[in-house]
Each structure stands twice: as C-alpha cells, then as structure tokens.
Amino acid sequence: MAGNSIGQHFRVTTFGESHGLALGCIVDGCPPGLELTEADLQVDLDRRKPGTSKYTTQRREADEVKILSGVFEGKTTGTSIGLLIENTDQRSKDYSEIKDKFRPGHADYTYHQKYGQRDYRGGGRSSARETAMRVAAGAVAKKYLKQEFGIEIRAYLSQMGDVSIDSVDWNEIENNAFFCPDASKVDAFDELIRKLKKEGDSIGAKITVVAQGVPVGLGEPVFARLDADVAHALMGINAVKGVEIGDGFEVVNQRGSEHRDPLTPEGFSSNHAGGILGGISSGQDIVAHIALKPTSSITVPGETITRSGEKTELITKGRHDPCVGIRAVPIAEAMLAIVVMDHLVRHRGQNFGVQTETPKI
C-alpha cells in the first residue's frame, strides 16, 4: 500500500488500523523552534474523537496522543515528529458476521480484490479511525500557520440532508455538537438525527472549510496548483464524494460578468473563486466545500455477496455514526492546514525574495 503520505516539503505519513494496537504518523518538514506539546494536539483530537456526543458513534476512545520524537524541551527540533495514539475500545466481535461478507457501500470488496485479503474488523486501514492521525498532524500545521503567519483554518457543518444553514457565526460553532454556525438550525439537525436513529438509517452532509489570512502567491502551477492539492487532500477524506472550491458547481449557472471577482485598490469586491486564481492563492479567504455520503453502516438490511460470490443479506452491527459529516469538521481543517503548510514551505524556499511594484490588496 503506497498511498500513505501527503505533502512534499511538509509531509505527513500515517499508519495503523481501526482495531489494531495503535495509530501513528510521522510529520516531516516542520521548522524548528515551534513550541509544541501534546496538549496542543489534543484540542482538535477531542473535537474529532468518538463517544463524545449522542449524535455520533458510541465507541469510546480517549485518543490521547503521544509525541515520540521531534520535540525537545518543548520545541520542535526540525527532525521527524513521531505521533502515536493507542486503540483502547476495540469490539472486534461486532464484525464477526462480515468476515465472509462484503458490506455494500464500503471498501470491503475493493480491498479484498486488490490485496487478496482484508482486515474486516471495522474496515481496518480503510476505516475513518485512521483520520485521527491526520487531525494530530494537522494540529501541528495549524499551530505553526497561526503563530507564525496569522493564518487561521476553521470549518463548519453547512448542510445535513435537506437542512441548510442560513448564516455563519464563528462563535456559535463550538456551542453545539454539530459544529453548526447557525444556532437556528441546531434543533432541525437534532430532529433529523433522532429520526434517522429510529429508522436505523443515515444521511449525508456538506462541510465548509475556510483558511483566513493566507498570503498571495501560494501554489505551484501547473500540476501542483493550490486548488488541485486542496481538492486532492479533501477528496482523500473517508466518505467524501465531492469537492468544491469557491462557488464550485454553482459556476455552471453564472455569467462571466457575475463570477469574476473585480479588483479595486481596497481589495477584491467578491470571492467567487474561493481565494485561488490560476492555481495560486490571491490573498483572499480560501473557501472549500466537501460533500460526504451517508454511511452504509446501518441496520437497514442490504443486499450483498459472500467471499465465494453467493447472494446474501447483511445488517451492519456495531457502533456507527448516523452522519459521518459531523466528525469530519476537524478532519477537513487538518487536511487544508497540511496543504497550506506544505505550499507555504515550498513558496518560501523558491520565492522568498520576490518583490513586485504592485501593492498587495
């Protein structure tokens, strides 16, 4: 399996399975001198971890991260940062029924066909449990970006099923279990989740992630455009089936006179492009949206086949999220942070001394 790393200069490599002994990652390329403790990383891990809300899976993992290397006397050394989280609440017996059956809508069938075997306990490497290490690594990037450059990366739940938010109040996001910025929609989300639990079903969601304070100039055309790398990173999150930058697919219905973002001496007058032009950051907020599918781990019976190809039916047992989009909020933040951090380090290496006569707006 070769696809375990992301980034070029700021590079993250993860390892581990859902029901294995532990999850881990190596973070390469973090500059030396950054004050970093396990508590810095734990904040975002606690936002992502299971068992903290009645709306998500009741698997209870402490997700306590340990820094194994790369930090000395409270500061990064510039060497590889090793991070580890031990798994403590595995209930592998919940998955005994799917040992010889493929869960429809999951990676069971494709992993089995590709590798000739699979870890059926919670999906093994394909489980979203792996994203805990992405969040830990992303927390390193988030702290550096904010502390050194004033770049802040935040996300929120913007839609669940047919319920969409009408406004964004950043101060409201941490006041509810949905990471919802619109207090008037929390009750509707609550009602929807309760209904789904009774039905044994699930629902999809849309997450919006924003990077504020990103300087102009990040991105490496033509094959490492900033928007291309952002899309690649966000699309790599479990259950994501679509990524939009800026207005995304809404541009299909827009005229050029509407979509273009006029430049003025005071700055851009709109941000339909989502903060990226020609694959390079414009200095505006970088805005992306991801669509997450409804999980197939539900108690509604589904048609499938056995390892020998025989027709059968499956009801998924275990502890699962009725909407995986809720816990995807800190994951989206982490992936965007990793990409911005990587491009910042790349840009600094090649274009550090570049100056132009044009003022930055």
From Swiss-Prot:
Keywords on record: Amino-acid biosynthesis, Aromatic amino acid biosynthesis, FAD, Flavoprotein, FMN, Lyase, NADP
Protein name: Chorismate synthase
Residues annotated to bind FMN: 125-127, 238-239, 278, 293-297, 319
GO molecular function, one term: FMN binding
Catalytic activity field: 5-O-(1-carboxyvinyl)-3-phosphoshikimate = chorismate + phosphate
Origin species: Aliivibrio fischeri (strain MJ11) (Vibrio fischeri)
Annotated Pfam families: Chorismate_synt (PF01264)
Cofactor binding notes: Reduced FMN (FMNH(2)).
Residue positions binding NADP(+): 48
Pathway connected to this protein: Metabolic intermediate biosynthesis; chorismate biosynthesis; chorismate from D-erythrose 4-phosphate and phosphoenolpyruvate: step 7/7
Assembly and interaction partners: Homotetramer.
Protein's job: This reaction introduces a second double bond into the aromatic ring system.
Highest taxon, organism lineage: Bacteria
Annotated GO biological process: amino acid biosynthetic process; aromatic amino acid family biosynthetic process; chorismate biosynthetic process
EC number, UniProt record: 4.2.3.5
PANTHER family: CHORISMATE SYNTHASE (PTHR21085:SF0)
Cofactors that this protein relies on: FMNH2
Gene3D superfamilies membership: Chorismate synthase AroC (3.60.150.10)
